Curated annotation (Swiss-Prot):
Residues 75-155 form the GS beta-grasp domain. Homooctamer. The gene is GLN2. GO terms for cellular component: chloroplast; cytoplasm; mitochondrion. The keyword Ligase applies. This is Glutamine synthetase, chloroplastic. One of its GO terms (biological process) is response to cadmium ion. It is an enzyme of class 6 (ligase). It catalyses: L-glutamate + NH4(+) + ATP = L-glutamine + ADP + phosphate + H(+). Pfam families: Gln-synt_C, Gln-synt_N. Belongs to the glutamine synthetase family. Its main location: plastid.
Length: 428
């Protein structure tokens, strides 16, 4: 279990079994009647273990994990939004009179935008519009996490609201007809809180060279597995379409995959999965960073590789459609790079399984290219492409919408298309 030391107690986070009644009673605590079936079930628990004040902490644990469903129809909704930096997440809670199934059943809300860098002090109110609902793995029961986007009181999206523009792209009839699928590989790095140095690294020093750590097992090679596993289970409970996890090449770095997701859902699921990860690392006393190159030198950076396909790409003859998409992406390389995350120039150097930020390239099974096509896709003549350029701190609404726009809605001039095809050795 991941542990964070706090005054007079330790906090553990993870998926744990309920404490037996006898053990709880022996500790001086009370066993709450919690339903174990249906939507009210939560396998994700916050557990506080006392070193000095056992009775007090046991009661705290019970309150944190208490399922209120048998006692009230009211639920807690955690409203979540993207903050002023465009990468930070904010949230606050409110009571809703009864369980809800759709975001349209939830009220709009507001917050102080001057405290998040999203509005001036003299006109600070920013309005939250509920857009997607997920089950709350921290509170359990019928409680929910709510992904919101942000608007002025007049109903205009504020500059950091990238979801609004993405929703417009994904509602375009041409895009809808192509049913765009996204599979996003979110990499992240765990840091020791007081020193901001990767988990498992000696303070002020370095571990052995890369090689033994990717998908590794063992206490000398894998650092943070408890956090990765707790996050995996919490995402499954929440209803996020998480499809896998693995330890990464750099020690202390991990990856999880979300998808395939259709359209705007991809962005919603990545943002909520990031929120859940932030909450878990908060409880574990570990710092989460999405910096694309947290450690300079001969160490891998952190990306957010985005696998993408359209209906036409997935059908027979789809490889030709993929090649046309690659051609379009090459012609808008600079636009995509500018939208693919802050600090990406430190990562896209042409080393450590990346392409150069300055040059567009593509290849089959080549992880040193901007766009990779899998051998399976080449062999079958249909499938998907992988855009390896996005940084770990990218906005998934921006990246997914831009991929759809460039490959479905945007048409280059014939002259530009011919020149690009010749340069990339693409026959389209």
């Amino acid at each position: 279990m991941a542990q964070a030391v706090v005054p007079a107690m330790q906090c553990q986070v993870g998926a744990v079994r309920a404490r037996p009644a006898a053990a709880a009673a022996a500790a001086g605590g009370r066993v709450w009647g919690v339903r174990r079936t249906g939507r009210g079930t939560s396998g994700f628990r916050v557990m506080a273990v006392s070193t000095e004040t056992t009775g007090v902490v046991t009661r705290m644990e019970q309150l944190l994990n208490m399922d209120t469903t048998p006692f009230t129809d009211k639920i807690i909704a955690e409203y979540i939004w993207v903050g002023g930096t465009g990468i930070d997440l904010r949230s606050k809670s409110r009571t809703i009179s009864k369980p809800v199934e759709d975001p349209s059943e939830l009220p709009k809300w507001n917050y102080d935008g001057s405290s998040t860098g999203q509005a001036p002090g003299e006109d600070s109110e920013v309005i939250l519009y509920p857009q997607a609902i997920f089950k709350d793995p921290f509170r359990g029961g019928n409680n929910i996490l709510v992904m919101c986007d942000t608007y002025t009181p007049a109903g205009e999206p504020i500059p950091t609201n990238k979801r609004n523009r993405a929703a417009q792209v994904f509602s375009d009839p041409k895009v809808v007809s192509q049913v765009p699928w996204f599979g996003i590989e979110q990499e992240y790095t765990l840091l020791q809180r007081d020193v901001n140095w990767p988990l498992g690294w000696p303070v002020g020093g370095y571990p052995g060279p890369q090689g033994p750590y990717y998908c590794a097992v063992g206490s000398d090679k894998s650092f943070g597995r408890d956090i990765s596993d707790a996050h995996y289970k919490a995402c499954l409970y929440a209803g996020i379409n998480i499809s896998g996890t693995n330890g990464e090449v750099m020690p202390g770095q991990w990856e999880y995959q979300v998808g395939p997701s259709v359209g705007i859902e991809a962005g919603d699921h990545i943002w909520i999965s990031r929120y859940i990860l932030e909450r878990i690392t908060e409880q574990a006393g570990v710092v989460l960073t999405l910096d694309p190159k947290p450690i300079q030198g001969d160490w891998n950076g952190a990306g957010c590789h985005t696998n993408y396909s359209t209906k036409s790409m997935r059908e027979d003859g789809g490889f030709e459609v993929i090649k046309k998409a690659i051609l379009n992406l090459s012609l808008r390389h600079d636009l995509h790079i500018s939208a693919y995350g802050e600090g990406n120039e430190r990562r896209l150097t042409g080393l450590h399984e990346t392409a150069s930020i300055d040059n567009f390239s593509w290849g089959v099974a080549n992880r040193g290219c901007s766009i990779r096509v899998g051998r399976d896709t080449e062999a079958k003549g249909k499938g998907y492409l992988e855009d390896r350029r996005p940084a770990s701190n990218m906005d998934p609404y921006v990246v997914t919408a831009l991929l759809a726009e460039t490959t479905i809605l945007w048409e280059p001039t014939l002259e530009a298309e011919v020149l690009a095809a010749k340069k990339l050795a693409l026959k389209v």
